[in-house]
Design a protein with these regions (language model features):
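Thiamine diphosphate
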Residues: 1-160, 165-167, 171-172, 385-387, ...
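Broad hydrophobic/π-residue packing in well-ordered secondary structure
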Residues: 8, 60, 71, 100, ...
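Flexible, low-complexity linker and terminal segments
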Residues: 12-29, 33-43, 47-51, 186-411
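Flexible loop/turn segments at secondary-structure boundaries
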Residues: 64-68, 90-93, 114-117, 139-143, ...
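Active-site/ligand-binding-proximal alpha/beta "capping" segment
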Residues: 164-187
């Protein structure tokens, strides 16, 4: 039927003008068409396999994240365990429990669900257990626009927990990149024993593109902190940290000699005993922050795209990647000097971010919110960045960004 319709379309003389889309120029390889939710799901499966762990996904159905649950439920042959909970809190709590037992634990949701999960995320952070939290953003607040894209949960991802509770935040920038973003979120969670928030949005989740399938052997193996023996001569210290990553050991229930208590109460460094000591709480608060900031040394550098001799840099994150890249291409072709850089890691920022930003006189930040990354960049790097903001439930078009960036350059 598809071929018949195609043949009819190219032969019928019903139109005054026709336009044939040229075949895409793609590197050689095996391709499949993929959307962001499927790419993200496959990235989680690949991460579990490369870490030699079972994957646990606890979720409550919510648009536009539900398809992750649907996709993962098809892959029990890869030891994927899917759990549809009675509510968002139960889904997150079950995932924390799965992490405690040695699973690559993931919970997924959209904005309203992220708010409900916040206390349980704090528990994972306090217990220092690996957990990936997927937030497929949509229009808000409240029920908002469930089927429309928005990037308005960035500040909540960074700060939406009680107490001093920093955690890594990364963002997928395209449907195919969602695979690698999920893999990276899993790597960080497992290596550093921390919850990680992975941001997607409806545009990435339901958008589609051809994807060159990677070979599983090309993906790096993922390290874990699983321990099977005593880590001191005198016994087991559940919060004796790795000197490089500051991660604590991951002792699984049932391992002889490695019994310990864990929960939401503050713990004593080393022993993990409940502690109300003032100096210890200060140290543990600082240590949890150091652990996250230290990740900046273990992530990709921020790369410049376009004319590096330009005075203007367009900074973006998440699903604005395609529109920004196309707009920069069009402006460069017109002779307008402009470059771009795109954040995947937002907390912490790549360690060369200041170096990149300092090369340019003008910083422009397009976002599908009212300027959340803009505020972060201004605060962190003391630059007078300017925003291009849109909260209409629609993505930026390439032409829209081309026009608005050129206007900002000429101001």
């Amino acid at each position: 039927a598809l071929k018949t319709g195609y043949n009819f379309g190219i032969t019928v003389e019903a139109f005054h003008h026709t336009y044939v889309v040229e075949k895409a120029s793609l590197p050689p390889g095996e391709y499949t068409n993929i959307n962001g939710n499927i790419g993200l799901s496959w990235g989680l499966i690949a991460a579990a396999k490369k870490a030699n762990l079972d994957l646990f996904y606890g979720s409550y159905p919510i648009t536009p994240a539900s398809d992750i649950l649907h996709e993962l439920s098809k892959h029990k042959n890869f030891n994927v365990i899917t759990f549809q909970a009675e509510d968002e809190i139960a889904a997150a709590a079950a995932s924390v429990g799965a992490s405690f037992t040695g699973k690559l634990a993931v919970t997924g949701t959209s904005g309203p669900g992220l708010a409900l999960k916040s206390e349980t995320i704090s528990l994972a952070l306090s217990a220092e257990l690996p957990l990936v939290i997927v937030n497929v953003q949509r229009g808000g607040p409240s029920t908002g626009l469930p089927t429309k894209p928005e990037q308005s949960d960035l500040m909540f991802a960074l700060y939406g927990r009680h107490g001093e509770s920093p955690l890594p935040v990364i963002a997928a920038k395209s449907p195919s990149h969602a695979f690698y973003a999920a893999y990276e979120a899993s790597r960080i969670a497992l290596k550093y024993m921390t919850p990680v928030i992975l941001l997607s949005d409806n545009y990435v989740a339901t958008g589609s593109e051809p994807w060159n399938l990677p070979k599983i052997e090309e993906l790096n193996n993922l390290d874990t902190n699983i321990i099977t023996k005593l880590n001191t001569e005198d016994g087991f210290l559940p919060f004796l940290r790795n000197v490089d990553t500051f991660a604590r050991p991951w002792a699984l229930p049932g391992t002889p000699g490695l019994e310990y208590r864990v929960g939401g109460l503050e713990k004593e460094e080393g022993t993990g005993n409940v502690s109300y000591d003032a100096a210890n709480h200060q140290y543990m608060t600082d240590m949890r922050a150091w652990k996250v900031s230290n990740i900046a040394n273990d992530i990709d550098k921020l790369e410049i795209y376009g004319d590096e001799s330009a005075d203007t840099l367009v900074l973006g994150w998440g699903s604005t990647y395609g529109g920004i890249t196309q707009a920069v291409n069009r402006l460069n072709e017109k002779g307008v000097k402009v470059a771009s850089a795109h954040f995947v890691h937002i907390n912490p920022f790549p360690d060369n971010t200041l170096e990149v930003i300092s090369k340019f006189k003008k910083i422009i930040i397009p976002e599908l919110n009212t300027g959340q990354l803009l505020k972060l960049v201004r605060e962190a790097f003391l630059v007078d960045a300017r925003g291009i903001n849109k909260v209409s439930g629609e993505p930026f078009t390439a032409q829209e960004l081309t026009d608005k960036i050129e206007e900002k350059i000429n101001e």
